[in-house]
Amino acid sequence: MTTQRKPYVRTMTPTWWQKLGFYRFYMLREGTSVPAVWFSIVLIYGVFALKGGVDSWAGFVGFLQNPLVLLINFVALLAALLHTKTWFDLAPKAANIVVNSEKMGPGPIVKTLWAVTVVASVVILAVALV
């Protein structure tokens, strides 16, 4: 015997995520993937320009000096920093580190991750500029 009752289907508007700050921030964080794709494409373009020789590399550097490209790269940098911050804030929740029978707080883990990021960035810049 089947029932004639219709199931309740809750309506969902396309802007449902705009009502709560948590969801807006989630969508912003997920949106950081778009600038990451831009950065990846520019990086691949740079590798092929480097392989192509001096003229190709000069064209790539000229492309990077375009004000619109500089603006997009700045937005990509901000997006990468936001994404990094959210992942570093998430890392202590996944790690259960116990020191002297007490669970370590998130502060030292996050600070260590940022310190490693800064040191790695400085080393990469030093190698690139020498």
UniProtKB/Swiss-Prot annotation:
Leader sequence segment: none
Compartments, record wording: Cell inner membrane
Membrane-traversing stretches: 34-54, 60-80, 109-129
Highest taxon listed in the record's lineage: Bacteria
Membrane topology: Multi-pass membrane protein
UniProt function note: Two distinct, membrane-bound, FAD-containing enzymes are responsible for the catalysis of fumarate and succinate interconversion; fumarate reductase is used in anaerobic growth, and succinate dehydrogenase is used in aerobic growth. Anchors the catalytic components of the fumarate reductase complex to the cell inner membrane, binds quinones.
Species, as recorded: Serratia proteamaculans (strain 568)
Cellular component per GO, a single term: plasma membrane
CDD domains: QFR_TypeD_subunitC (cd00546)
InterPro entries registered for this protein in UniProt: Fumarate_red_C (IPR003510), SQR/QFR_C/D (IPR034804)
Upper lineage: Bacteria, Pseudomonadati, Pseudomonadota, Gammaproteobacteria, Enterobacterales
Family designation: Belongs to the FrdC family.
Assembly and oligomerization: Part of an enzyme complex containing four subunits: a flavoprotein (FrdA), an iron-sulfur protein (FrdB), and two hydrophobic anchor proteins (FrdC and FrdD).
Molecular functions (GO terms): succinate dehydrogenase activity
Entry keywords, A to Z: Cell inner membrane, Cell membrane, Membrane, Transmembrane, Transmembrane helix
Gene designation: frdC
Record-given protein name: Fumarate reductase subunit C
